[in-house]
């Protein structure tokens, strides 16, 4: 019983922490792609997204692939960085509009909310945030106005420290 109380208490703290990042990102008009309580490898217990004014909810649904496609060379082969990792680029507006109507990636302006199934932590996926798994020099496109990396230093700082406020 005490482990349930611990998980509940930590979950509340994580949600409040991630809401801090979320709120500051939205204040500065940065897209937040996902907001999750708990981690969700492979699938999520609950996923929800507001599309055209209506909430769509899915239970026990597999995760949506990121809106990224491999960067190709002139021969049609995947480009790789110096470490041999594939390079990706964001989907173009035309590629996004070509997705089926039911594909949530077609609606990048709204946040996907969810509950994962691994009860450790949570996350807030902010558009254009370059983390330790990415190299900013390998990003092929110019920063978009709604991306984290396009914001002033003080705005990025507010978004980062928003989790502790």
Predicted regions and their residues:
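Pore domain of cation channels
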Residues: 156-165
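Small-residue-rich helix-interface/hinge motifs
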Residues: 2-139
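Short, membrane-interfacial amphipathic segments enriched in basic
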Residues: 142-151
């Amino acid at each position: 019983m005490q482990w349930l109380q611990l998980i509940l208490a930590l979950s509340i703290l994580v949600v409040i922490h991630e809401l801090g990042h979320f709120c500051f990102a939205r204040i500065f008009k940065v897209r937040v792609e996902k907001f999750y309580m708990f981690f969700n490898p492979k699938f999520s217990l609950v996923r929800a997204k507001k599309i055209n004014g209506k909430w769509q909810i899915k239970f026990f649904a597999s995760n949506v692939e990121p809106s990224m496609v491999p960067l190709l060379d002139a021969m049609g082969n995947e480009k790789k960085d110096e470490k041999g990792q594939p390079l990706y680029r964001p989907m173009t507006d035309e590629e996004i509009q070509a997705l089926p109507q039911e594909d949530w990636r077609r609606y990048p302006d709204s946040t996907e909310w969810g509950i994962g199934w691994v009860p450790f932590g949570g996350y807030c996926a902010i558009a254009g945030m370059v983390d330790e798994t990415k190299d900013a020099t390998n990003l092929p496109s110019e920063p978009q106005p709604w991306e984290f990396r396009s914001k002033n230093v003080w705005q990025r700082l507010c978004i980062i420290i928003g989790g502790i406020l």
